[in-house]
């Protein structure tokens, strides 16, 4: 077993390491040689079979899953349920002991109690199982990503194979629309682009080509990865990784192999069980010894021991906690947070660090034109539907020239039948940048289609990674000018070097060094804002060289690509969501650290972080300080910088201590260009600091981090199936602001669970104490076991649940996250208040009512002591009371049952006050008010239920409840009032002397 664990740990540590391969660096000939493949014919069938035998099929290995019955048993026998099962078994044991000793009187009580306890556990176990049945289907969702078929070269023949039959060294062809069937080294490519977003988090499609461009295998252009989508062009590649050894396979192995540990609330409930069990066993054993010393038979003493332990078990609490969490989960679902795991409801409330993805979570995942540069000035683009924010002259020649090039030099088109849809919401064919430009042109001119029709496209060279530009030639809409119009867009520096003139303020002027500097300043400024900048230029081809009908050749350009006229720049960004800055500010005031973890470029990441407030105004990074002081970065003390932007490259070989140093000393952090393994390392680093970590993500690459986090939050709209399976919670609107709502709800439910528990536990003392007096002073039993059940599973249930609806006492988002070590769900102070203070007053109320009724019927209090043996003896039918009246056995038992009923009603009456004081932990009830209508209903409900149980005919047979005289309801009222006054005084002192001894002893 230990060996297996060691092996699993070793495997996971391997998977956590960065991808370390050299297939992208070595010459292609060496690649063929290493893989035993032939560029002309591919593998032979014999080679393929041998490779498959050696490496296995090209598919993901499913992990060992926990059988459903084991999950069900965990719900049925785990945690709190175990305490109730112990109680049930002890009841059956007591029943067995009494049955064997021939004591018929209490037989049925213990039997009923055992059956009811077992039923409660089974019902709540089934309920929890259905609520939390998040059977980890992570691997199933990875299977959905696996391509089904692939076109491969075997023995010189192109054959269609099942993707799982591919093996190392196979040469395959991939075209637009396919999923990449394995990890491939690119041999040749034609305008080939892949969507790596689910793997690396980059929202832009990435061009792939045979050139080696980066040491990092995830960044180089000559590798394409298993299960990513081909979105443009065609490609030929050689298989260098299959199944579990692909990048995707490693992520799958990491996500499914991680051990997630217990949730904070599960730890709290375990801690609570220890306390309750400790109290129960201590009391039970103490009174077992006392009973023995007092001369009771050992069988009686064992029954007493069991009775005390069972009376200590709050039978209704398991159901209360489950229902409270379910209600909060439903409330969160209505606010766009879908909780898959009930315990995650509270985890979000105790979160102290949020590691958020950028694309789609903090931003809109919709590239938008943000700025333009023409006529020598930077202008903010207007992306409003009605153009109400326009800040530039749309009649200027500079703008008209730029927008015409933008409309023509683009392959993006609106999908059909969307004329009634607002422009910003229309779907577009083409990549994200092209779509942004198309929408910008359509918003400002409203006639993209018309411009294209008037200037018919003749020839085009599509964008490719080598040229870094796109160029097209069009007929001129000005029919009097027969010249063809050439338009070009691309990387600004590449466009500028192809231009000899610039169009400025309606005139074409020569490109001077001064103008180049103005261009560079604009380019740097826009780039520094984290925006993706494109340059635009045009040229009217001379009529003498390019007459009407000239045969343009796109493959071997027979037209000029230099000496062009520069028109301007457009810059795009994936803009932040409107609600995010406010949400980040709320997190900060709630003491929650927000860290951005993204696969995007550091400059873009930093710009978005600044715009949403993750890096607050005035806080500098090491680079900012170095730039301000004009010194090298190495001379700046990292601790002087409050903010940090960490490149994924720095994390490749970082030690845990160095990462801890970064996390500890920088309150504001952005991790950029991170890989899936690095996201996981960052989460583990935060957890080492003692933080409770929430992680947001939408890609497959986020799934290991989502699984490892204390709470993983996936995106409902843009999220991949894999990320949704790995997460504990799904944001239905993909909005970071919804997490803050979730944190608020989580904190509120933790506070309210404390209130529910203190309310429920208080009635334990009036339930246990009758039993103790029964043993110590030999009095007739004041409260029966069945009656205890009527309280725990009857009158107390609805009030306890109603506290889940209580409003927050103060702004819970203005305090720091709870410390899991010191701020427990149930602590000594809560036990002291429930048992030692309020519980004692309640017990006094019960005994007062008991003695009043006994005295009224003839048994004065001092005459009850030592009476039990005669009272419980069937043989005694002439027991005399304090006034000389004789009582038969049946009459005595009827009086005893009336006392049980009155004691039960008195507990209900003092629980009125207990429920009202439990509404707040510090504030006065008068401040809080009685706006919780569910709680108001609960007060009426428990009273009506008590009356129903007391006055319904037939209850004397089933529950031994007898109708009470009306005046027997009143003796407990002063005690109820006393509880209210006592607690209001305690809270008044709490508020007047914060941190004083009253707070230290009683504030739970």
From Swiss-Prot:
EC number(s) reported in the record: 7.2.2.13
Membrane topology value: Multi-pass membrane protein
List of catalytic residues: 357
Residues at which ATP binds: 489
Keywords: ATP-binding, Cell membrane, Ion transport, Magnesium, Membrane, Metal-binding, Nucleotide-binding, Phosphoprotein, Potassium, Potassium transport, Sodium, Sodium transport, Sodium/potassium transport, Translocase, Transmembrane, Transmembrane helix, Transport
Subcellular location: Cell membrane
Name under which the protein is recorded: Sodium/potassium-transporting ATPase subunit alpha-B
């Amino acid at each position: 077993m230990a060996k297996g664990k060691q092996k699993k740990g070793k495997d996971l540590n391997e998977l956590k390491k960065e991808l370390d391969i050299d297939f992208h660096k070595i010459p292609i000939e060496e690649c063929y040689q290493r893989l035993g493949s032939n560029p002309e014919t591919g593998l032979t069938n014999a080679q393929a079979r041998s490779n498959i035998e050696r490496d296995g099929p090209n598919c993901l290995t499913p992990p060992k899953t926990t059988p459903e019955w084991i999950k069900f048993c965990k719900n049925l026998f785990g945690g709190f349920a175990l305490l109730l099962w112990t109680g049930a078994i002890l009841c059956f044991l007591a029943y067995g002991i009494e049955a064997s000793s021939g004591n018929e009187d209490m037989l049925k009580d213990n039997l009923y109690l055992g059956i009811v306890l077992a039923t409660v556990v089974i019902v709540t176990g089934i309920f929890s199982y259905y609520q939390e049945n998040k059977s980890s289907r992570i691997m199933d969702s990875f299977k959905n990503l696996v391509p089904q078929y692939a076109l491969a070269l075997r023995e010189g023949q192109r054959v269609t194979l099942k993707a799982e039959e591919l093996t190392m060294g196979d040469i395959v062809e991939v075209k637009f629309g396919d999923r990449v069937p394995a990890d491939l080294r690119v041999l040749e490519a034609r305008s080939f682009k892949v969507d790596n977003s689910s793997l690396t988090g980059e929202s832009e499609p990435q061009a792939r080509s045979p050139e080696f461009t980066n040491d990092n295998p995830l960044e180089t252009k000559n590798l394409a990865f298993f299960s990513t989508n081909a979105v443009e062009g065609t490609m030929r590649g050689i298989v260098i990784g299959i199944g579990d050894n692909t990048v995707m396979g490693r992520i799958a192995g990491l996500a499914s192999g991680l051990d997630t540990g217990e949730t904070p609330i599960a730890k709290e409930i375990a801690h609570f069980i220890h306390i309750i069990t400790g109290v129960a066993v201590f009391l039970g054993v103490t009174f077992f010894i006392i009973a023995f010393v007092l001369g009771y038979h050992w069988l009686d003493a064992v029954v007493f021991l069991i009775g005390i332990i069972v009376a200590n078990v709050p039978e209704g609490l398991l159901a209360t906690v489950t229902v409270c969490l379910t209600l909060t989960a439903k409330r969160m679902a209505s606010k766009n947070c879908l909780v898959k795991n009930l315990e995650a409801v509270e985890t979000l409330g105790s979160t102290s660090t949020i590691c958020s993805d950028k694309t789609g979570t903090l931003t809109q995942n919709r590239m938008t034109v943000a700025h333009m540069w023409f006529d020598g000035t930077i202008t903010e683009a207007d992306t409003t539907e009605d153009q109400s924010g326009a800040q530039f002259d749309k009649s200027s020649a500079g703008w008209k020239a730029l927008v015409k090039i933008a409309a023509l030099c683009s392959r993006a088109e609106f999908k059909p039948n969307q004329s009634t849809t607002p422009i910003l919401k229309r779907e577009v064919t083409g990549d994200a940048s092209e779509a942004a430009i198309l929408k910008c042109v359509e918003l400002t001119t409203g006639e993209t289609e018309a411009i294209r029709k008037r200037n018919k496209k003749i020839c085009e060279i599509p964008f490719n990674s080598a040229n870094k530009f796109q160029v097209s030639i069009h007929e001129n809409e000005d029919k009097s000018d027969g010249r063809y119009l050439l338009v070009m867009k691309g990387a600004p520096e590449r466009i500028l070097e192809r231009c000899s003139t610039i169009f400025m303020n309606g005139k074409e002027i020569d490109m001077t060094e001064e103008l180049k500097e103005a261009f560079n300043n604009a380019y740097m400024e826009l780039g520094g804002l984290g925006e993706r900048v494109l340059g635009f230029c045009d040229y009217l081809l001379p009529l003498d060289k390019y007459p009407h009908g000239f045969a343009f050749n796109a493959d071997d350009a027979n037209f000029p690509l230099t000496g062009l006229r520069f028109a301007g720049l457009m810059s795009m960004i994936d803009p932040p969501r409107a609600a995010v800055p406010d949400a980040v500010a709320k997190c900060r005031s709630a003491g929650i650290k927000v860290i951005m973890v993204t696969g995007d470029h550091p400059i873009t990441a930093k710009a978005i972080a600044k715009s949403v407030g993750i890096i607050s105004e005035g806080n500098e990074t090491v680079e900012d300080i170095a730039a301000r002081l004009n010194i090298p970065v190495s001379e700046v003390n990292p601790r002087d910088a409050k903010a940090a932007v960490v490149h994924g490259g720095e994390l490749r070989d970082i030690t845990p201590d160095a990462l801890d140093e970064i996390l500890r000393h920088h309150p504001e952090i952005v991790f950029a260009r991170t890989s899936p393994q690095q996201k996981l390392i960052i989460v583990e680093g935060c957890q080492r600091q003692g933080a409770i970590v929430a992680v947001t993500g939408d890609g497959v690459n986020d799934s290991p981090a989502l699984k490892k986090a204390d709470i993983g939050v996936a995106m409902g709209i843009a999220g991949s199936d894999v990320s949704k399976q790995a997460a504990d919670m799904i944001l239905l609107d993909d909005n970071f602001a919804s997490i803050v709502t979730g944190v608020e709800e989580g904190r509120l439910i933790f506070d309210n669970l404390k209130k529910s528990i203190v309310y429920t536990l208080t009635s334990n003392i009036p339930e246990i104490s009758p039993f103790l007096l029964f043993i110590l002073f030999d009095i007739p039993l004041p409260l029966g076991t069945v009656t205890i059940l009527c309280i725990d599973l009857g009158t107390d249930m609805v009030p306890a649940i109603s506290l889940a609806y209580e409003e927050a006492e103060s702004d819970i988002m203005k305090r720091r996250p709870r410390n899991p070590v010191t701020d427990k769900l149930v602590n000594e102070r809560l036990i002291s208040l429930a048992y030692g203070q309020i519980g004692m007053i309640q017990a006094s109320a019960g005994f007062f009512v008991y003695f009043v009724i006994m005295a009224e019927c003839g048994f004065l209090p001092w005459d009850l002591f030592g009476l039990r043996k005669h009272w419980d003896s069937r043989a005694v039918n002439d027991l005399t009371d304090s006034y000389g009246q004789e009582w038969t056995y049946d009459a005595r038992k009827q009086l005893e049952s009336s006392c049980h009923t009155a004691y039960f009603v008195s507990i209900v009456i003092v629980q009125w006050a207990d429920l009202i004081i439990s509404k707040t932990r510090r504030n006065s009830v008068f401040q809080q008010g009685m706006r919780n209508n569910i709680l108001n209903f609960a007060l009426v409900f428990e009273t009506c239920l008590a009356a129903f149980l007391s006055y319904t005919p037939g209850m004397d047979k089933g529950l031994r409840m007898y109708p009470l005289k009306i005046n027997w309801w009143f003796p407990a009222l002063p005690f109820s009032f006393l509880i209210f006054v006592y607690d209001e005084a305690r809270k008044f002192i709490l508020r007047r002397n914060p941190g004083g001894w009253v707070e230290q002893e009683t504030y739970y």
